[in-house]
Design a protein with these regions (language model features):
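Phosphate-binding site recognition
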Residues: 1-428, 443-445
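Conserved catalytic cores of phosphodiester-cleaving nucleases, focusing on short active-site segments
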Residues: 436, 460-462, 466-477, 491
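Active-site metal-binding core of divalent-cation-utilizing nuclease and nuclease-like domains
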Residues: 140-144, 439-465
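Mg2+/Mn2+-dependent nuclease catalytic core
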Residues: 169-175, 475-494
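Domain-level recognition of nuclease-like catalytic cores that cleave nucleotide substrates
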Residues: 496, 500-524
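Metal-dependent nuclease catalytic cores in nucleic-acid-processing enzymes
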Residues: 178-185, 339-347, 437-442, 487-507
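Structural motif
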Residues: 149, 467-469, 505
């Protein structure tokens, strides 16, 4: 048995101080953090998906600016920092501010009151938030004689959650008032760092702070959040060995599975280093289990606000393209679905050519989560109605139980092509392909639609751990099961997969031409 009992992983811990004092494993980013704090620009903005380590980064910066040298013993920063100046820090965590103007005001009032007490600011009863913020910055400087570090974490949380509600404009107005102060207080500020997921350019953070440097795409900061493959192999060997032992894998097989599930993020066209989702990776290694941790933590809750009719569009996103100007500078509310999906972590950079980014799904966890999210809207059924059937379909495909798998598939697609009016613009076979590929993706299979081979185009290839399913679909009024069977035999659709170690199963499937569902199937 691999011993990992003496190693603590920082599951659910966002405090750098707590990570260090409890002796938790810490992936050392302090050399990059020191460069950002000392060699970067004064005003910095970093966008990364939710649960990607932004808050730990902000907390580490706070500990650094507060001069807490003891927390950094043994880390890379000790070779770089010589002075350890303790300076005043103003930190705001806007994820605690709710999604209504009243809750935003309440949070700012409470946060400012704490800072006013610390820096002995006399507050007039009629003072606006902008005046109070200005006075806090000046008082912190005057009391210490040192310029202030200002850290604003998850700045966009109230704006994102209030988007497309009556509260959004009022929340935006508060932001314009308060954060315009940052520019006028330049001489009192040492370093300003703002994190978020999505970019709302109409607020004063971006319109007033014309010197705000968006470091989100800079190559030197590509891995400032998240965990690289090199760091995984260096820091997590005992946990990977334990996972391998539990699952009956070799070490390399365990790494390959972790990579397929949680790796694949890229944040700079000039530094395409692979980055793992840290939340999912650390949870998976702590549990010795591969699950959809990031998605199940609420990651998909904002999708309906930003992506209309997503159930019809998912296949268009992998791959998709977006102009450099759009992805690097545009407001999320006007940049299209691709921009939101990139900023929030559902798409990542796959390549770059002549001013155009190529985007795609980063990994299996994200892809499955997206398809799982849209399946109820596509099938016109609730999650509760289809989850049991989905589970049975997945198990049947894993075991090669064709009769049970086709029974489940028939139940899931019954009447859907006919009943879902959003599909009306598609021809009937196209509707079936969309519905079936969404179902297979949602249960975690690897799916290729209309796969080209030397002899023709296969309607669908569905892969599980033990099986490769080659599907040919035919409508009842287009020859049905007999035509599908004949085409598979003549064109030898299963032949290119025979070298695969997995069992290859060729399936001819007949579908009702009126959209009522699966009529018949046959193993070829």
């Amino acid at each position: 048995m691999v011993e990992t009992n003496d190693r603590k992983l920082p599951v659910g811990i966002q405090s750098f101080e707590e990570i260090r004092k409890q002796g938790c494993l810490y992936v050392d980013k302090t050399d990059i953090i020191w460069q950002l704090a000392n060699r970067g620009k004064k005003y910095n903005y970093l966008s990364r998906p939710r649960r990607f380590g932004k808050s730990v980064l902000v907390d580490t910066l706070e500990s650094y600016f507060l001069g807490k040298k003891e927390l950094f013993e043994g880390l890379k920063i000790m070779q770089l920092e010589t002075e350890w100046v303790k300076r005043p820090v103003i930190r705001l965590d806007m994820s605690q501010a709710g999604a209504e103007p009243e809750s935003v005001r309440s949070y700012l009032d409470d946060a400012f009151h704490t800072l006013e007490t610390e820096y002995e600011v006399v507050v007039r009863q009629d003072s606006s938030f902008a005046v109070r913020f200005k006075n806090i910055i000046e008082a912190a400087y005057n009391k210490t004689g040192l310029q202030v570090a200002i850290l604003i974490d998850e700045y966009d949380s109230p704006l994102q959650h209030s988007w497309k509600t009556p509260h959004h404009e009022a929340c935006t107005s508060i932001y314009r008032e308060v954060f315009a102060v940052l520019k006028s207080q330049d001489k009192y500020e040492k370093f300003v760092f703002i994190t978020g997921i999505t970019k709302f350019t109409q607020i004063s953070l971006f319109s007033v702070l014309n010197n705000l440097s968006n470091i989100s795409f800079e190559p030197e900061y590509a891995a400032i959040c998240g965990i690289t493959k090199e760091e995984v192999l260096m820091d997590f060997k005992p946990e990977i060995n334990r996972l391998a032992e539990y699952e009956g894998w070799t070490f390399d097989e365990a790494v390959a599975q972790l990579t397929a599930y949680y790796d694949g993020y890229h944040f700079s066209r000039r530094n395409m280093v692979d980055v793992f989702n840290p939340f999912s990776l650390i949870n998976a290694l702590a549990d010795s289990d591969l699950k959809n941790y990031w998605a199940s933590s609420g990651a998909t809750s904002m999708l309906p606000k930003f992506v209309d009719d997503m159930e019809l569009k998912l296949d268009n996103f992998d791959p998709c393209t977006i102009l450099r100007q759009t992805i690097e500078t545009s407001d999320v509310t006007g940049g299209g679905a691709e921009l939101f999906l990139y900023q929030s972590g559902y798409l990542t950079i796959k390549g770059y050519q002549m001013g155009v980014y190529i985007l795609g799904f980063p990994n299996n966890e994200v892809k499955q989560a997206l398809y799982e999210t849209v399946l109820p809207a596509l099938t016109l059924r609730s999650n509760g109605d289809i989850q049991s059937t989905q589970s049975s379909l997945f198990l049947s495909l894993q075991l090669g139980n064709l009769s049970e798998a086709m029974k489940c598939l028939k139940a899931l697609i019954a009447d859907v092509p006919y009943s879902n009016k959003k599909l009306a613009s598609m021809d009937m076979e196209e509707r079936y392909r969309l519905i079936m590929s969404t179902i297979f993706n949602a249960i975690g299979c690897r799916v290729e639609v209309e796969k080209m081979i030397a002899t023709g185009r296969i309607d669908m290839v569905v892969e599980t751990i033990n099986f490769v399913y080659v599907l040919e679909l035919k409508l009842s009024n287009n020859g049905g099961i007999d035509a599908a069977t004949e085409q598979m035999r003549v064109k030898q659709y299963a032949e290119p997969f025979k070298a695969d170690k997995r069992k290859v199963i060729a399936l001819a499937i007949e579908l009702d031409d009126k959209g009522k569902g699966l009529v018949d199937w046959k193993e070829v």
